[in-house]
């Protein structure tokens, strides 16, 4: 079996848990705290549901629900037959006859079904119109096809039919979600009990997040739906829930006032749950810069320089300021010969300089946040964005005034862009990624 812990035990050895045994992965003075009767939701890159650490002694799954957002949305009628055939060629199937030692290798065949019909019998509703939700029963059919009991409402489905192929979750390609789930909840079956997670007897709820890689805009909606699903599912089972979110973005003001952060605050009050989110690794990545001017001064003249590395296809620059401040902005291309001035009126504007298309969105304060936002989306008119040092010139306006004087600038997190992209004079302050900046997380 693939190892899911790797070198994580070194960090555990230096953790704040007293008397923590790095060999067994357990607190020697709290052996009764095993997570039994609770659930852990892993919102990440998916989980290898076949791994022994996520299975019971009898081989059945410990995963109560697995929502794979990356799969095409599949609608099922009462006979559990896929009626959304337009997406069928992109679905991932696994043969019920290819099991070996209860550890089924992935089968990427997509066109071996007969009559373009797949069988799926999830008992979990999918009101999100996104991906496929697999129930505990669905996963057990994949893991133990010859011994699975068939629900009475699925009498037309034969798990031993040699031509039947079951829809299955897609692979956890990066392995990150599997690694995280092992640290949280692995029961140690793959290592004969030598390496266990923190809560080895907890149940699991898994969401493989859909990643909109083609868009420069951060898709927080999929994450919000994932949290909503996990909390509602756990509450329906009366299970205390711990939600782990190994996800973070620089897209936002980092003040707890975004829709995502406010959503996290509200959902934390629903049922019995606690939300844990990764804070990111942005401190030394040069993706944040700040200016702090003197309030009520008459003149102000500064520049922010940032480098776009060769090979960037798209990225964004985000600027946040207090609404009461009046600033004049002008963006210069690396040549210094092309530039454009930001309009004073909110709206969406398009510019083309240095063979690069830049969409500028200006948003005024909303009922839930008091800041003005400038969002610049860079994309290439050829192959890549023009590389080099871009300069944002900032001045006070002749008729305006500076009340607060603080300006914050963000580029995408390091995972989204080339490591050489960044501000020339960065700031390591306020570099926690969203949603770890929410007050209830």
Regions from the PLM with identified roles:
Residues 1-441:
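Loop-rich non-cytosolic ectodomains and luminal regions
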């Amino acid at each position: 079996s693939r190892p899911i812990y790797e070198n994580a035990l070194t960090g555990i050895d230096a953790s704040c848990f007293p008397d923590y045994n790095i060999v067994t992965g357990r607190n020697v003075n709290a052996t009764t705290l095993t997570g039994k009767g609770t659930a852990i939701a892993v919102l990440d890159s998916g989980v290898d549901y076949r791994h022994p650490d996520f299975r019971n002694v009898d081989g059945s799954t410990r995963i109560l629900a697995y929502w794979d957002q990356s799969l095409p949305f599949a609608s099922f009628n009462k006979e559990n037959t896929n009626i959304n055939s337009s997406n069928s060629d992109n679905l991932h199937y696994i043969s019920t006859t290819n099991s070996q030692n209860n550890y089924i290798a992935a089968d990427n065949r997509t066109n071996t079904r007969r009559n373009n019909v797949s069988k799926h019998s999830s008992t979990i509703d999918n009101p999100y119109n996104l991906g496929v939700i697999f129930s505990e029963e669905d996963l057990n059919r994949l893991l133990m096809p010859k011994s699975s009991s068939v629900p009475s409402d699925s009498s037309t489905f034969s798990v031993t039919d040699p031509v039947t192929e079951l829809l299955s979750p897609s692979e956890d390609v990066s392995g990150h979600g599997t690694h995280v789930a092992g640290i949280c909840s692995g029961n140690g079956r793959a290592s004969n009990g030598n390496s266990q997670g923190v809560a080895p007897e907890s149940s699991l709820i898994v969401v493989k997040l859909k990643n909109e890689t083609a868009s420069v805009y951060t898709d927080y909606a999929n994450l919000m739906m994932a949290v909503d699903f996990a909390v509602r599912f756990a509450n329906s089972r009366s299970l205390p829930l711990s939600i782990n979110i190994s996800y973070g973005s620089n897209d936002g003001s980092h003040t707890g006032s975004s829709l995502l952060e406010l959503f996290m605050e509200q959902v934390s009050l629903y049922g019995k749950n606690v939300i844990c989110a990764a804070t990111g690794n942005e401190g030394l990545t040069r993706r944040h810069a700040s200016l702090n001017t003197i309030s009520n001064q008459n003149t102000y003249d500064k520049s922010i320089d940032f480098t776009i590395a060769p090979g960037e296809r798209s990225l964004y620059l985000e600027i946040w300021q207090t609404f009461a401040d009046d600033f004049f902005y002008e963006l210069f291309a690396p040549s210094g010969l092309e530039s454009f001035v930001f309009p004073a009126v909110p709206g969406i504007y398009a510019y083309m300089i240095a063979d690069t298309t830049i969409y500028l969105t200006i948003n005024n304060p909303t009922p839930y946040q008091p800041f003005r936002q400038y969002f610049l989306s860079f994309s290439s008119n050829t192959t890549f964005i023009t590389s080099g040092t871009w300069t944002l010139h900032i001045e006070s306006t002749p008729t305006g005034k500076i009340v607060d004087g603080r300006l914050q600038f963000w580029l995408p997190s390091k995972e989204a862009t080339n490591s050489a992209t960044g501000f020339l004079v960065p700031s390591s302050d306020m570099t926690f990624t969203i949603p770890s900046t929410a007050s209830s997380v």
